Amino acid sequence: MDLPLERHWRLVVTPPAPGAWNMAVDEAIVEHHALGVVPPTLRLYGWRPAAISLGYFQSLAAEVDVQACAREGVDVVRRPTGGRAILHDREVTYSVVIAERLLPGDVVHTYRVLSLGLLAAVRRLGVAAELADVPPVGAGGPTAACFDTPARYELEVGGRKLVGSAQTRREGVILQHGVVPFDLQAERLFLMLRVSADRGALARTLEQRATDLGRCMGRTPSVEEVQEALAGGFAGALGLELTAAPLSEGELRRAAELAGRKYGQPHWNERR
């Protein structure tokens, strides 16, 4: 299997932030990496306040109850990547930004390569995870929630999805980001989604199809513990040398523009 052609990556750890800012930072890193200004980057971050991120192709009006989100104090933001809705709260989120020329291959291949870093990370935490090869067929079909079925090469434990990820490409650069959840909060998630079936039943189904670190480890890990495992897992599995560094001034300026003009605006979040 082909590993990344560039071994020297930047590790960026940013504090919890609103959803619009988080998505803006990921895009700013993509733009700056495309220009050759910054190296391939592994970013680790959190969300404050909690947020629901919507897949790029989802309909906000059809799938998310915005008023329920407001009552819960939960932001809503559309991701630049596909997939379904995710509740971001008790978790660590990762993003990887790397030029396609430095990680050649189609989406499935690159997804598998990056999943090896995630697999090594959760195994460092003592979790006996595996890569899902063929998605299982579950009764009832998928819902608007991201974690209801594992996709190919996503992490699962005992047949239950643990880490959900999504990938997009632009300007010759791969952006993949995903969630390592401490607590699924299935009931809370379905309170904020527009669904036709019984919310309690959907939450129970999700808990049968997905899991979280709290259940796998028998305790809730610290954010720092999981961040350390992710950095070590990616470095070890992909043969990387990670150098901790902050976002550049240019990335910060561009992220502020994108958060204000794009990810924080109705024209982006309500576009479908």
Predicted features by range, described:
Residues W47-L60, T93, V97-I98, V113-A120:
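Extended cationic-aromatic binding surfaces that line active-site or macromolecule-binding grooves
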